[in-house]
Amino acid sequence: MSLLEGIIDSRNNPLAVVEDIAASNNWPFERSGEDELTIVSKGQWTDYQISFTWMGEIEALHLACAFDMKIPVARRPEVQRLVAAINEQLWVGHFDLWTHTGMIMHRQALVLPGGLTASTAQCEAMLAGAIHASERYFPAFQFVVWAGKSTTEAMSAAMFDTEGEA
């Protein structure tokens, strides 16, 4: 790769946009490599580890928003049913249960073919969408994992929106 190609590649790397967003919001972040950046965001229920990865080979910016909840093996079948029920409600992104770690995460990707660049608005929308979905459904995961509730019970509780704060 020539020096010029390296400069063009670094300008088109959407992680620079994500890094600017994190810095402007005073969110702690870490670049673990030239193609990965992780932000820590405090939520109402838990802290979120939000990893953005630039996947040059498929020209996509991948987001994975994980929270600290390890799913016990005995509860995984019900959690998988809950993930399916939640994903039916989502228009953008999806939740996954990573079976090898037992972790839940919200994932989505922004495809940027042919050298397109990500805008600040696109990256902010990805970030906001992941946090919103995680905040909305975190209690449902808690109900299933720690309270032993069914998917139906957890979804009923998650779909109940309250007004204001107590």
Label the predicted regions:
Residues 20, 24-48, 52-63, 67-68:
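Ser/Thr-rich, low-complexity intrinsically disordered terminal regions
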Residues 6-7, 64-72, 116-120:
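Short histidine-centered catalytic/ligand-binding loop motif
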Residues 98, 109-110, 116, 122-135, ...:
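Long, contiguous binding/interaction regions
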Residues 2-8, 41-43, 74:
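Amphipathic alpha-helical hairpins
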Residues 66-103:
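Short, internal acidic amphipathic alpha-helical interface segments
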Residues 142-166:
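Short, highly charged C-terminal tails/helix-capping segments
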Residues 1-20, 66:
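Terminal, regulation- and interaction-focused segments at domain boundaries
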Residues 104-108:
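Short, aliphatic-rich beta-strand segments
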